[in-house]
C-alpha cells in the first residue's frame, strides 16, 4: 500500500520534487530476479568471479547498516564515504579496496544497465514529465550513483545527488542529504516533496527535515492509484 503524507491539497503546489531511484523509478522485484539470472550465467562463464559476489553481498549489507558499521570505522576524516565503505568491506573479506571497488562497479553499476529498461515505472515516469512540463524542479537523490541509470531509464532531472557526494557523505535516513538539496535550491521544507519506496530510508529522512513524502508500494496495481494525485 502507498503511504502518503501531504499537507498540501494539490500535489502540484510543491516546488521541488525529490525522487529516490532504486525501487522507486523502476520495479525492483522483477528486476532483481532478472539480475539474479544474469549473475548466475556470468558465474558459470567466469567461475573465479564467485568470490566477488560474496564481496557484493557484504558491501550491500554494510551500506544498508552503515549507521552501525560506520561507528566502527576510524577513517572518517581521511577518506570519502565510498572509500571508507570499500575499505571496510575489504578488511572484512580479506581483499583489497580496489577489488571491492571493481566488483561494485561491474556487478552493481555496469551490469544492471543491460537489463534495467523494461522495468521502468511508467507511472512515475509520466509524473516526472508532467512536472517538467509545469516547470517544477525534479531532483534525484539516491544512496547509489544515478546518472547512468537515469539515462538508461530515459529520465531527465534538474539535479542529481548521491550519498557519496562530498557535501553529503552519509546514508539515508540521515537528514543531511535532503537538507543539502533544500539549501541548494533555497527551498523551504514545506515546499518540497520526497517520493521513495522505503519509509525507513526515504520517509524518515523526509520527516526529519519537515518534508512531506510519498512512499510508493512495490506493485504496479497500487502505484496506479497514485495517478489520482495529479490527474
Regions of interest found by a model, annotated:
Residues 46-50, 95-98, 156, 188:
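Short coil/loop linkers at secondary-structure junctions
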Residues 65, 69-72, 111-114, 131-132, ...:
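A short, structure-level motif marking secondary-structure boundaries and short turns
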Residues 1-17, 125-130, 136, 141-231:
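Asp-based, Mg2+/Mn2+-dependent phosphohydrolase catalytic module
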Residues 91, 97-140, 175:
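Short, acidic loop-to-helix structural element flanking the phosphoryl-transfer center
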Amino acid at each position: 500500500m502507498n503511504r502518503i503524507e501531504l499537507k498540501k491539497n494539490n500535489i502540484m503546489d510543491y516546488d521541488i520534487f525529490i525522487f529516490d531511484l532504486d525501487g522507486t523509478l523502476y520495479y525492483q522485484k522483477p528486476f532483481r530476479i532478472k539480475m539474479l539470472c544474469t549473475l548466475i550465467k556470468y558465474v558459470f562463464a567466469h567461475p573465479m568471479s564467485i568470490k566477488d559476489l560474496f564481496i557484493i553481498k557484504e558491501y550491500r549489507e554494510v551500506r544498508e547498516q552503515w549507521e552501525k558499521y560506520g561507528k566502527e570505522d576510524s577513517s572518517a576524516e581521511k577518506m570519502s564515504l565510498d572509500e571508507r565503505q570499500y575499505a571496510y568491506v575489504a578488511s572484512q573479506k580479506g581483499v583489497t579496496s580496489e577489488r571491492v571497488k571493481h566488483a561494485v562497479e561491474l556487478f552493481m553499476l555496469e551490469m544492471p544497465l543491460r537489463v534495467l529498461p523494461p522495468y521502468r515505472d511508467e507511472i512515475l515516469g509520466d509524473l516526472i514529465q508532467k512536472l517538467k512540463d509545469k516547470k517544477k524542479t525534479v531532483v534525484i537523490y539516491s544512496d547509489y550513483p544515478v546518472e547512468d541509470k537515469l539515462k538508461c531509464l530515459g529520465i531527465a532531472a534538474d539535479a542529481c545527488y548521491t550519498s557519496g557526494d562530498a557535501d553529503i557523505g552519509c546514508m539515508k535516513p540521515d537528514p543531511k542529504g535532503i537538507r543539502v538539496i533544500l539549501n541548494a535550491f533555497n527551498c523551504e521544507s514545506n515546499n518540497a516533496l520526497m517520493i521513495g519506496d522505503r519509509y525507513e530510508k526515504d520517509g524518515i529522512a523526509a520527516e526529519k527535515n519537515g518534508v512531506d513524502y510519498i512512499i510508493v508500494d512495490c506493485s504496479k496495481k497500487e502505484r496506479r492509484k497514485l495517478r489520482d494525485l495529479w490527474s
